[in-house]
Amino acid sequence: MKNNVKKLLCAALSTAMITGSIVLPMTASAETTPIFDGDTVEQEWKFDFGAAGTNAEDGYTLVTPDTNYVTNKEYGFLGVDEGSYKLGNRFDGFGNQKGQVIKLAAGGGEGLNDAIGSVGEDSFGNAGDVYYPTRFALKADDEAYYRVRATVTTLDTTKDAEISLYTERKHPIFTDTKVEAGQTKTVEFSVRPTPIYYEKSEPKGEIADGMVNVCVAGKNSAIASIEIQKVQEYPVFWVLGDSTVTDGNCSLPFFRLQNYTGVGTGLTKYLPRNYAMVNEGEGGLNAADNYHFNMVKNRIKKGDFLYVEYGHNHKSDGPDGYVSNLDKYYNACHSVGATLVIVSPIERINTFTDGAYQHTLDGFATAGAKYVADKVTAGATDIAYVDLNSYSLDFYNKITTDNGGDSGAIKFYFQTAKGGGTDQTHPNDAGAENLAYEFVKAAKAVTDEIQKAALAPVVNNFTDETPNLVSTEITSLGSAPNSAWPQYVVPTDNEYPVVIKDIKFNEAGEANYAKVLVQDAKIDFGAYGIIVITVKDENGEEKGKIYAIDQVDNSTGNGTQEITHFTTDVKLEEGDTYTATVWKAKDNGGDTGLTVDPENVQYSAEYIPTDEEQYLLNEDKDGNEQFDFKSNI
């Protein structure tokens, strides 16, 4: 297994098998009615949610509020015991913090007339139903195909509910949907558990999925029943991209405006329900990536789609470097009969002039469009281009216009936790949901007949859902973040979210390596960070500053990161000294790239080498000599 969590769950499974607590699935029979017409059903599970001691509906297994997945192991709830924080947030996208326990209760009634939902509140007064999802999981086989029918209802049958339902790693099926008192809402969708590769965040490597997840959140929300069928294969919509595309795992309390979430996550709300969406994106990637690409290449099949969206992290090679990597994606799709969708990157919100947000990444849009057009001209019929870049910019400016020209209005779709500055690159859950809808609109607007036909199986069957805008109840409280953001402070002695562990220079005196540690801290890591190295001469006079070209990424979670590209106009010479600090960055795109944000938010303590006068010559893995200053931090 890849980590201790998996070992823990395996141990719990062994115990459950000995005690006989596991309920095995019913083998499908000729009388089994498939959830989706035409499916061949191999196995089936039916769960009825209610209080202990009540009777389950005929043919269903009773799930009670104390059915804990970790101890029951075959199925049950996540996040319901003191040790839940050790599970992390990679199973269903939600993660308990130390000291948090989700409290569940049944609503009353028998059979399918009962339900289970989150109740109570945490020590900061955050309501359980709103901020602590009811998180159900079924042990499942990776690489297998599942259909799900979930029925939600109101926990208190005398009151209305506002419910959001998620699957897998916080993929929305529907959000903020009103369910009237005592009524139900049933939805059917598809899930393909798939290992996910993590290159930038820890623990690293290929991490098993192994679950079908169904979670609900929202005022008075509850799960009434879930039916799951393991079936033969069906189409999959694969997603590759960077931090603006990847799944955005979060820590509780859950609030849609305080978590990084990529556009790929939001797609599940609109994709045809007979497609499963698998997001293999990760923060910090660009189109040259191979690890995540190979995860898809080794699994994609005829009839599948591959969505590829890159651009933000091509800071050193630009659109030319981006487009030079696209052939491998097309060849992988073409060889198996799948369809490639090249998607231009979402825009940033950091360039506001003349009353409107401006393009910073349109060079990638132009390059991607030309690449696809050239392929089509050469005879390709299994590729399409979708201009999300322009549609995202139009969305930002519409929000601004609709709010009287207020440029801060769109920040509600990018602002995350309090205290770390406004992120200008990464959408939150609300932003991802709306930007995914812009993809839907852009895909429907494709006019080239070849590309339009390639997209037709998806575009002609989009689910009829629309995005939810941030409510005026939130925006009326002031600029983001405001008092609507839930209060929750994790005790920590760390002042800064980033620690610089090492800085290295090559023989020419050029900075070429930095190692940093991202950690929980009193200051929130709210946006990209930029390493700034200040060089002084032997008299203590400043010679200039060296700036990292690559960001310290705030979207990949805690752990170490390595930065290898820096500006070279200032060099460290014999007798010089230096210090380094991580500041909040502004990502300008184009030739400008990262700069220090005017807000001047400091993300690290000042890094001071132990010996500012002497250096040691090292060789890196390629045999290049380096100046290696050791830190005393």
Describe each model-derived feature in a short phrase.
Residues 77-140:
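Surface-exposed, low-complexity/disordered Ser/Thr/Gly/Pro/Asn-rich loops and linkers
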Residues 289-324, 334, 347-350:
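Oxyanion-hole/transition-state-stabilizing segment in secreted/luminal serine hydrolases
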Residues 214-221:
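Short beta-strand-plus-loop segments that form exposed binding edges in beta-rich domains
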Residues 49, 223-281, 294-302:
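Serine-esterase "nucleophile elbow" of acetyl-processing enzymes
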Residues 19-35:
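Sec-dependent signal peptide cleavage junction
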Residues 350-481:
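Catalytic His-Asp segment of secreted/periplasmic serine-dependent ester chemistry enzymes
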